[in-house]
Design a protein with these regions (language model features):
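Extreme N-terminal, non-catalytic leader segments
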Residues: 1-29
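The Walker A (P-loop) glycine that initiates the GxxxxGKT/S ATP-binding motif of P-loop NTPases
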Residues: 32
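Walker A (P-loop) phosphate-binding loop of P-loop NTPases
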Residues: 35
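Conserved lysine of the Walker
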Residues: 38
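Hydrophobic positions on the alpha1 helix immediately C-terminal to the Walker A/P-loop
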Residues: 41
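Conserved nucleotide-sensing/catalytic segment adjacent to the nucleotide-binding pocket
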Residues: 57, 66-114
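ATP-dependent NMP and nucleoside kinases share a basic, alpha-helical "lid"
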Residues: 117-175
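Small-molecule kinase domains that catalyze NTP-dependent phosphoryl transfer to phosphate-bearing small molecules
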Residues: 123, 145-148, 176-216
Length: 216
């Protein structure tokens, strides 16, 4: 059963404690359903840790989307409807990134997702002296192959949860803000047909995180 974190400061203290006990780089893997607020939470944790002198970097898995051209060749012209599902990511490369983030002592370039071009771009960099990695993404704790290899490279695992009704509205607004839909109602429909389906899969097919933060 997962422990419960009551505040971001509790997560910061937990990361500090782990870092004090681990030689070399620390890697913490964070999962959660789309719209739960993972990125916001881990960025707050990273800012606090960097302020304490622990060089911390947030790395997201969104850059490991298959490019749209490749995705269309894989599943057809309506691939955009399914983008964000587990099979629309290059899982093998995500696993390899998890290994590098934990084990490499060199600078590590990595892809991020450009919302301007709606495709991955190689513009991220983890510097070799980074002490702690916060690797966040929807599917990082799936118990499906090959995703289930990721936890072998994690010093700790965290989950972020949020009320499902809030998640649905946040996702709809996100789709509207990014130009994927033209009305909030269309955003809700897209959330229902894709993001919330993926969220249900995450809940049902992920290993429990060591500690869970309930977002508000």
């Amino acid at each position: 059963m997962s422990l419960q974190a009551e505040s971001v400061s509790e997560l910061v203290s937990r990361a500090e404690s782990i870092t004090s006990k681990v030689k070399g780089r620390v890697s913490i893997v964070i999962n959660g359903v789309p719209g739960a607020g993972k990125t916001t939470i881990v960025n707050k944790v990273a800012s606090a840790l960097n302020a304490k002198g622990i060089k911390t970097k947030v790395v997201g898995m969104d850059g490991f989307h298959y490019p749209m051209k490749q995705l269309i060749s894989m599943i057809g012209d309506d691939a955009y409807k399914f983008r964000g599902a587990p099979y629309t990511f290059d899982a093998a490369k995500v696993v390899e990134m998890a290994r590098l983030l934990k084990c490499s002592d060199e600078d590590i370039p990595y892809p991020t997702f450009s919302h301007a071009i709606k495709d991955p771009v190689l513009d991220g960099l983890v510097q070799k002296d980074t002490r702690l990695i916060l690797f966040e993404g929807n599917y990082l704790l799936l118990n499906d192959e090959p995703w289930d290899q990721i936890r072998a490279y994690a010093d700790d695992t965290w989950g972020v949860m949020l009320n499902p009704n809030i998640v649905r509205k946040r996702i709809a607004q996100r789709h509207l803000d990014s130009g994927l839909v033209t009305t909030f109602e269309e955003g809700l429909a897209k959330a229902d047909s894709n993001d919330l389906v993926n969220g249900k899969y995450i809940i049902e097919h992920s290993i429990p995180a060591n500690i869970v933060y309930k977002n508000t």
